[in-house]
Amino acid sequence: MNPNQPPNYPPGNPNQPPPFPPTPYYPMYQAGMPMPYIPQSPQYPQPGPPGGPPPFMGIQIKQEPMWSQENRYGMQAGPSGMPGMPPSSHPYGYPPMHGMPPGMPQGMPPMMDPNMPDFSSPPMHHPTTSLLAQHLSSAPLPPAPPQQQSHLSQLLQQPTTYSTATNPHAAPTQTIARRPDNEARNAQLQEQELAARQQQQQEYMLQQHQQQQQNRAGQLQAEQAFANPPTVSIPPQTGHPPQQTSASSQQRAQETMAQQTEPQSHIRESPQKETNLEKYSTGELCLYGRELVNDLNVKTSYLSTILKKVMERKPLNQGENPNDLADQCKNALQRMSDIRQIIEKRREPTWKRMTGEDYIELMLDDSELKKPMDEERQKRRAELEQRFAIVISKTPPVEGHIWYQGKWISEELHKKYMQFEANKEIVKNLAAELKALAWKIDVTSPGHLKKVDQTKISKKKTDDQV
């Protein structure tokens, strides 16, 4: 007899269910319900250290035969507590017993008296299930967490109030319990668009204000430029800068050369404001005209360079526009013409323009004059002395005038010339002293000293110690 074959079954193949008994003999062994009198398999020693695990850890449960896991006599296989098996439709997880009438209920009858205690047995587990699975199946479930409403549902449940504070003649406020999602979304989008438009308008107003301030500053600078003569730019040198005695001097020379040789990317424009030139004196108009001449020289040179690039079909740099530059040159010429007309109108009616012959006659010395002079030359010489008495006359044309640099000038103007010469000498001496100080600083700078070799010093110390 096979040891895995239950003793209360007739002998046969252990992998196949036994045939149905001919007599009303029902087995005492039900599937999944081992009886206490069935002998268990012998216990074998378990591997491990001496002493071994606790007794309950080494218990081996006898496995059921293969045929007991399948359908037997039309019953479903296994109890509901077996891991990996679907729950059974029978009460308590076991199939109905054999020999019972078909109309009799298979489960325990329900308790009729609610006051009676519950004597129902706990759920049975399959012998092969682990202790953890049995504990988890018998443990109570944790309480369910409270369900929180979503943020969207809370927003939809809030009442929406429409206020008419901006319109005093409107009807009183109305409270609506809920508003559709698309209406709320549209209102939010409209508010965002309105805020964006207001921000753009504020930025545009700020830009306009800054532009007006810049234009006003340029106009004021142009109006003040009349009293300040412009500085004439030094033409670029073709040679290399002279060698200096220090690295800083060479660096300054290189920076100066780079500034002189690089093209002028920003051209100073003439004032575009239509100012009234009549209110300025003749001297101020002359200074303004000199500034326009210097500006025109730079712009015409730059314009010729751009036109050459255009003719050679070379790409222009950013900001190079020959049309704008030509318009600026044209405006400068027109302004110079206006200044010339104003100065000409202020001259005396008897004034005549000096010709080339008149200028040569004025520059001649007495030793260069042919004597005796003819009548025509004497008449011409007398006319020039009358017109340019401050240059040709041997005596002061006005009492108190002083001869200075080939012409007669007033005493006040002579004092100003003297003060200017004194200040010029002071500035020259100060510039020379500053240059000498800079040269001393460059020469005596410790950065130009030779570096000390530490290895030689350490070697010398060791030699001295030895």
Swiss-Prot record:
Residues 1-25, 136-277 are annotated as: Disordered. Residues 265-277 have a biased composition (Basic and acidic residues). It comes from the Eukaryota. Transmembrane segments: none annotated. Residues 160-176, 230-242 have a biased composition (Polar residues). Residues 147-159, 185-224, 243-254 have a biased composition (Low complexity). Interacts with mdt-28. This is Glutamine/asparagine-rich protein mdt-30. It comes from Caenorhabditis elegans.
